[in-house]
From Swiss-Prot:
This is Alanine racemase. The gene is alr. GO terms for biological process: D-alanine biosynthetic process. The keyword Isomerase applies. It holds the Pfam family Ala_racemase_N. It comes from Yersinia pestis.
Length: 359
């Protein structure tokens, strides 16, 4: 028997990369592998996605892990550098960076570097998280264009705040803001991440930045990734470690929050919130077992969950239980738990075993 295991399908990762190329055929791809490649393993995912044109990460530590692991293609720091001391590290490792603040601009202007850096100026078109405000953008751009430490021309990027929602006015406004500033400027342009790739082809521009879609998961509540021709790259599974007779009126788990209305059989699966499965998953959350869906009952424990197998079940100790994967999309689990698919796949803990299928 195996305890909690995440099986990563390399074929699915490659398929998804090619599917994104089909969706954005005129754009180059920044494969976003931040946060341990959304829980899929940073180096393994990056090497599998070697046909990408560039890799996107959030932290310098992630970029340096890629370089140490043999990745030679361009790497983009999506959050930018944090301190002036980071700049020589970017130069030495040929790392590109977003620049979104006056502090970063001043650091670039003041630095003495052995070579200039490829820079992406981040424009705040409406996310209001990082980026240069539109009324300050032209002056900021001109200073970057005059900076000896910046490879010319300056590239321009932004990020949609609501591309994953049915409401379109906000995204239209952001795109119009981006175009008003970027039109006629010679650098590369990028604004579309996963949601923009799938729903906003007019926003694809020179570069797109696929994140969660690379892993076969939709950025939307619906439709699911499979509806866009994507394949789930992660299967999270574990094993039944107990099968028990359960009487009507008996509860199960901490707090006795679920009480059976009938005589039934309960199974116990070796996975819990200590593995990253959400403790808040309510009774009724589906699990895939022996070709059918069964339901979680009672509270998720640190190391175990209980499921209602049904009174006539023939399931046995050692049977494999699938928490999400091809048969049970992670988007479905997200809908049942109220926790985004982004969180589900990135929250797996270090004790979950990682297995890789394919070369």
């Amino acid at each position: 028997m195996k305890a909690a295991t995440a099986v990563i399908d390399r074929h699915a990762l490659r398929h998804n990369l090619q599917q994104i190329r089909r969706l954005a055929p005129q754009s180059r791809l920044v494969a976003v592998v931040k946060a341990n490649a959304y829980g899929h393993g940073l180096l393994a995912a990056a090497h599998t996605l070697q046909d990408a044109d560039c890799y996107g990460v959030a932290r310098i530590s992630e970029a340096l892990m890629l370089r140490a692991g043999g990745i030679v293609k361009p790497i983009l720091l999506l959050e930018g550098f944090f301190d002036a001391e980071d700049l020589p590290v970017l130069v030495a490792n040929h790392i590109e960076t977003a620049v979104h603040s006056l502090e970063q601009l001043v650091a670039l202007e003041a630095a003495t570097l052995s070579a200039p850096i490829n820079v992406w100026m981040k424009l705040d078109t409406g996310m209001h998280r990082l980026g240069v405000r539109p009324d300050q953008a032209e002056a900021f751009y001109q200073r970057l264009s005059a900076c000896r430490n910046v490879i010319q021309p300056v590239n321009i990027m932004s990020h949609f705040s609501r591309a994953d929602e049915p409401e379109v006015a906000a995204t239209q406004q952001q795109l119009a803001c981006f175009d008003a500033f970027a039109a006629g400027k010679p650098g590369k342009q990028s604004i579309a991440a996963s949601g923009g790739i799938l729903r906003w082809p007019q926003a694809h521009r020179d570069w797109v930045r696929p994140g969660i879609v690379l892993y076969g998961v939709s950025p939307f509540d619906a439709p699911y990734g499979r509806d866009f021709g994507l394949l789930p790259a992660m299967t999270l599974k574990s094993s039944l470690i107990a099968v028990r007779e359960h009487k009507a009126g008996e509860s199960v788990g901490y707090g006795g929050t679920w009480v059976s209305e009938r005589d039934t059989r309960l199974g116990v699966i070796a996975i819990g919130y200590g593995d990253g499965y959400p403790r808040s998953a309510p009774s009724g959350t589906p699990v895939w077992l022996n070709g059918r869906e069964v339901s979680i009952v009672g509270r998720v424990s640190m190391d175990m969950i209980s499921i209602d197998l049904g009174p006539e079940s023939t399931d046995k100790v050692g049977d494999e239980a699938l928490m999400w994967g091809a048969e049970l999309p992670v988007e479905r689990v997200a809908a049942c738990t109220g926790i985004s698919a982004y969180e589900l796949i990135t929250n797996l803990t270090s004790r979950v075993a990682m297995e890789y299928l394919g070369e």
